[in-house]
Amino acid sequence: MRLCDTDIERYLDQGIISLTPRPSNEKINGATIDVRLGNSFRVFREHTAPFIDLSGPKEEVTAQLDAVMSDEIIIGENEAFFLHPGELALATTLEAVKLPANIIGWLDGRSSLARLGLMVHVTAHRIDPGWEGKIVLEFFNSGKLPLALRPNMVIGALSFEVLSGTAARPYTSRKDAKYKHQQSAVASRISEDK
């Protein structure tokens, strides 16, 4: 069952769910809590690679990804990151999220931003039970104009559901968890898939 606003507030007060820094209670609405944009970004570099072979040997996939992904880009508090039409970028939420092993979270974009063509997550909007870290956003501008994104702007909303039981393999206890405790816009680690 999805948590309502009063349950989200209570779970935050009791430390069952943690968002750091904690948003004010005014940011809790109905069944969601607003999250803001952090200052860490990554983009695809200009490149001439014809493709990335995602099923190739791990070393080759890693080398191909390293060749096309930028280093981390840190934007100052009063600066803007410009996402141009047709571009994909990675970013993070300002808030770090910590969930227990019996709660799953969901990230949704804002309708007001979607109406401008901004997709906040391309496909990955699940926050696994036992997650600890910032949420990486997969931005895509499907609109016609560049969009100026600034740290601290409300970028999405989280909702939470209590599972039917406690997960036996929560994210932080998994040895194969590729993005455990992430604090920045971590590039794809698909080459670590088993």
UniProtKB/Swiss-Prot annotation:
The active site is at E138 (proton donor/acceptor). CDD domains: trimeric_dUTPase. Gene3D superfamilies: 2.70.40.10. Keywords: Hydrolase, Nucleotide metabolism, Nucleotide-binding. DCTP binds at R110, S111, S112, L113, A114, R115, D128, V136, L137, E138, Y171, K178, Q182. Its EC number is 3.5.4.13. It comes from the Bacteria. Pathway: Pyrimidine metabolism; dUMP biosynthesis; dUMP from dCTP (dUTP route): step 1/2. One of its GO terms (biological process) is dUTP biosynthetic process. Pfam families: DCD. SUPFAM superfamilies: dUTPase-like. It catalyses: dCTP + H2O + H(+) = dUTP + NH4(+). One of its GO terms (molecular function) is dCTP deaminase activity. HAMAP family: dCTP_deaminase. Catalyzes the deamination of dCTP to dUTP. Homotrimer. Belongs to the dCTP deaminase family. This is dCTP deaminase.
